[in-house]
């Protein structure tokens, strides 16, 4: 059921991109957006891990406490060993990326190594490895890529509105209402779809992570510390299209950022974990 729901949401996201292309350029724009969606999905499949790691200037490691924890989890649960990266960020956070369990990467900030105990770090990495195990990372990467393209088209539409038209519509008068809907509705709709995909999979990864590390309290304690640290010191220069990939929401502030978070409430995640029996 969760797989069918995710497929449906990804279809909605792709159709939204096609609609945005149609609003910008008529039938030709819709066809271009459809081709772009196919190319972007293929690109996300093959290169999403490299793109996201490069975006946050990740450094691959083959030793140290983070590598040791990931290696222990993989050996204990017979999982393929992913590449391990450290991000030069003081704010504690982590994410996973890649196209499948054999071609995956996990990344954590320098700050997380200063804040969490080894058990808590194991809980966080178990959560990320659960994403890897269930291929959530590929779905999240594709969703982030398409949502970013929709936001880009909406930004272009703002300029089109300023200069009086679509520039490539089949009619001369254009469609001001369609342009307005694209500017306002498309980014919001893309964010809502991302939120729906991310929230259900975060709860599942929490459960899976607890199973992988053997103690749900490891992750519960880590989430409590991570949420507090990110509230006090938000991560700078976060790309909104990739925010859903992190274990806790790196975007902070009021308005839409808090109302339409791609992450479930941390308090609820902690409550569910603490109510789990030791596995």
UniProtKB/Swiss-Prot annotation:
Locations listed in the record: Cell inner membrane
EC id: 3.4.24.-
Primary location recorded for the protein, binned into one broad class: membrane
Tell me what topology the record assigns in the membrane.
Answer: Multi-pass membrane protein
Sites where the protein binds Zn(2+)? 127, 131, 202
What is the annotated signal peptide range for this record? none
Q: Which family does the record assign?
A: Belongs to the peptidase M48B family.
Task: Kindly give the HAMAP family that the UniProt entry links to this protein.
Answer: Pept_M48_protease_HtpX
Q: What is the designated name of this protein?
A: Protease HtpX homolog
């Amino acid at each position: 059921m969760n797989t069918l729901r995710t497929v449906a949401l990804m279809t909605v996201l792709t159709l939204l991109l096609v609609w945005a292309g149609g609003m910008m350029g008529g039938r030709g724009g819709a066809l271009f957006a459809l081709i772009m969606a196919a190319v972007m999905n293929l690109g996300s499949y093959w290169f999403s891990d490299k793109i996201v790691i490069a975006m946050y200037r990740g450094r691959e490691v083959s030793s140290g406490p983070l590598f040791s924890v990931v290696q222990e989890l993989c050996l204990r649960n017979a999982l393929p060993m992913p590449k391990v990266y450290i991000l030069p960020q003081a704010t504690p956070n982590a994410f996973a990326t890649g196209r499948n369990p054999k071609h995956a990467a996990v990344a954590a900030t320098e700050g997380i190594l200063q804040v969490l105990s080894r058990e808590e770090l194991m809980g966080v990495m178990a959560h990320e490895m659960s994403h890897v195990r269930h291929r959530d990372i590929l779905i999240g990467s594709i969703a982030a890529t398409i949502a970013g393209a929709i936001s880009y088209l909406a930004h272009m539409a703002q300029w089109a509105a300023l200069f009086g038209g679509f520039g490539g519509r089949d009619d001369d008068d254009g469609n001001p209402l369609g342009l307005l809907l694209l500017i306002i509705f498309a980014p919001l709709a893309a964010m809502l779809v991302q939120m729906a995909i991310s929230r259900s999979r975060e709860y599942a990864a929490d459960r899976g992570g607890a199973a992988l590390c053997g103690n749900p309290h490891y992750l519960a304690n880590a989430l409590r510390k991570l949420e507090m640290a990110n509230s006090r010191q938000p991560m700078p220069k976060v790309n909104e299209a990739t925010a859903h990939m992190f274990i806790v929401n790196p975007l902070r502030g009021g308005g839409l950022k808090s109302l339409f978070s791609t992450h479930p409430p941390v308090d609820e995640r902690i409550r569910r974990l603490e109510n789990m029996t030791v596995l």
